[in-house]
């Protein structure tokens, strides 16, 4: 793995619009801009890879820009995430779909403002709060400036409403609808091609390989924070709606528009 990438992932600078040329050279930007049916893709765990493959089956995509986003809460082997991009290259080259080199993006300060700073306030105000909702919102919002830079109107995400019958608060219908509506404000589509895939076995079928959920991906220090002690899912949907309507939408829009004006 490139030491320059490792340095970025160690320091996690504000990296949303001004990318180093070794990562995103002008020649690559030019090629991406002139490529029709280009998509910016989320690269994280198993579902994100399956989502890209399914998206290429459902849409006439000609090129993928894989993006790896950081917050400040991940831990584990980053190399695993980048290695999975080779799965895409291997699977998509036969269909003449280009997979560009990955772009790393992130802003822990933006994440903190959106997800961390007001934890106590939101818990008291709404009676429920989970960082996971804002975190996944951040993951989609933070890709908007890059997509705009590349004249790309499509972002692919790997969210699913059900995971073998289990719910994740950041992937319930209310959350996913909110993510998609936010990108629409910027003239973009957040495409969730596996949104209604419930079975993990179907995900493995799309991947054409065994890959258990949660394996071969980074961990998060806040994982499962919305679960009760015995493991049941606990959340207040009304609290999530208010979080978006009263805070997250406005905060994220102001932040993203500020980045776009730079």
Q: What spans do the regions from the language model cover?
A:
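Nucleotide-activated chemistry modules centered on ATP-dependent adenylation/adenylyltransferase
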Residues: 2-262
